[in-house]
Amino acid sequence: MXYLPGPQQQAFKELQGL
């Protein structure tokens, strides 16, 4: 995935943290 800046990036980071 690419890099997603903004609030989407935070949600994506939580998905990877699972």
UniProtKB/Swiss-Prot annotation:
Compartments it resides in: Endoplasmic reticulum membrane; Microsome membrane
Reactions catalysed, as given in the entry: an organic molecule + reduced [NADPH--hemoprotein reductase] + O2 = an alcohol + oxidized [NADPH--hemoprotein reductase] + H2O + H(+)
Essential cofactor(s): heme
Keywords, in A-Z order: Endoplasmic reticulum, Heme, Iron, Membrane, Metal-binding, Microsome, Monooxygenase, Olfaction, Oxidoreductase, Sensory transduction
Record's bilayer topology term: Peripheral membrane protein
Highest taxon listed in the record's lineage: Eukaryota
A GO BP annotation: sensory perception of smell
E.C. number: 1.14.14.1
GO cellular component: endoplasmic reticulum membrane
GO molecular function, one term: oxidoreductase activity, acting on paired donors, with incorporation or reduction of molecular oxygen, reduced flavin or flavoprotein as one donor, and incorporation of one atom of oxygen
KW Lipoprotein (keyword) present: no
Main enzyme class: oxidoreductase
Function statement: Cytochromes P450 are a group of heme-thiolate monooxygenases. In liver microsomes, this enzyme is involved in an NADPH-dependent electron transport pathway. It oxidizes a variety of structurally unrelated compounds, including steroids, fatty acids, and xenobiotics.
Family listed: Belongs to the cytochrome P450 family.
Protein name per the record: Cytochrome P450 2A
Organism, scientific name: Bos taurus (Bovine)
